[in-house]
């Protein structure tokens, strides 16, 4: 009689555990499919913002700069705004560590966005000017 109860409890527990694993797998598949659809639909910045959780628009609003259009971005302006805001929010001067970390994440997000564009522009400029190796004379 006791073995019947143990077997029933084991089977019921196994069924519950199996259903929960199936539900978790379906949820993970749906999230993965959604992410692939976002990337395929042209939202290529979605994958880049996963690590910081910040969009490019949010980063531009925090740093109070215009979003880079066609690879044209004023890097000096971004860095000067970053330094000014970072120093203004120094916790030892009465600022907020939370705001300071948001400013750092905004700069990192902006750099991650314009990094490949800058490399591409530098490569095009090098091709246009021709390859000029640095020659060292002893």
UniProtKB/Swiss-Prot annotation:
Domain notes: The J-like region, although related to the J domain does not stimulate ATPase activity of mtHSP70. It nevertheless mediates the heterodimerization with the J domain of PAM18 and is therefore essential for PAM complex function.
Disulfide bridges in this chain: none
Record's subcellular location: Mitochondrion inner membrane
Annotated segments matching region J-like: 58-115
Family matches, as PANTHER family: MITOCHONDRIA ASSOCIATED GRANULOCYTE MACROPHAGE CSF SIGNALING MOLECULE, MITOCHONDRIAL IMPORT INNER MEMBRANE TRANSLOCASE SUBUNIT TIM16
Protein name listed in UniProt: Mitochondrial import inner membrane translocase subunit TIM16
Keywords, sorted A to Z: Membrane, Mitochondrion, Mitochondrion inner membrane, Protein transport, Translocation, Transport
Purpose: Essential component of the PAM complex, a complex required for the translocation of transit peptide-containing proteins from the inner membrane into the mitochondrial matrix in an ATP-dependent manner. In the complex, it is required to regulate activity of mtHSP70 (SSC1) via its interaction with PAM18/TIM14. May act by positioning PAM18/TIM14 in juxtaposition to mtHSP70 at the translocon to maximize ATPase stimulation.
GO biological process terms, semicolon-separated: protein import into mitochondrial matrix
Family: Belongs to the TIM16/PAM16 family.
Gene Ontology CC: one annotated term: TIM23 mitochondrial import inner membrane translocase complex
InterPro entries (alphabetical): J_dom_sf, Tim16
Topological type in the membrane: Peripheral membrane protein
Subunit annotation: Heterodimer with PAM18. Component of the PAM complex, at least composed of mtHsp70, MGE1, TIM44, PAM16, PAM17 and PAM18.
Transmembrane stretches, start-end: none
Gene: PAM16
């Amino acid at each position: 009689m006791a073995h019947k109860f143990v077997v029933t409890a084991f089977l019921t527990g196994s069924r519950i555990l199996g259903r929960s694993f199936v539900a978790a797998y379906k949820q993970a598949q749906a999230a993965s499919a959604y992410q692939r659809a976002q990337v395929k639909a042209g939202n290529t910045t979605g994958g880049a913002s996963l690590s910081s959780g910040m969009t490019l628009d949010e980063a531009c609003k925090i740093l109070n700069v215009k979003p880079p259009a066609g690879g044209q971005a004023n890097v000096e302006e971004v860095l000067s705004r970053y330094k000014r805001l970072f120093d203004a929010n120094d916790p030892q001067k009465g600022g907020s560590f939370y705001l300071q970390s948001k400013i750092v994440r905004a700069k990192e997000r902006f750099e991650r966005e314009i990094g490949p564009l800058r490399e591409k522009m530098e490569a095009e400029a090098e091709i246009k000017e021709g390859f000029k190796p640095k020659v060292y004379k002893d």
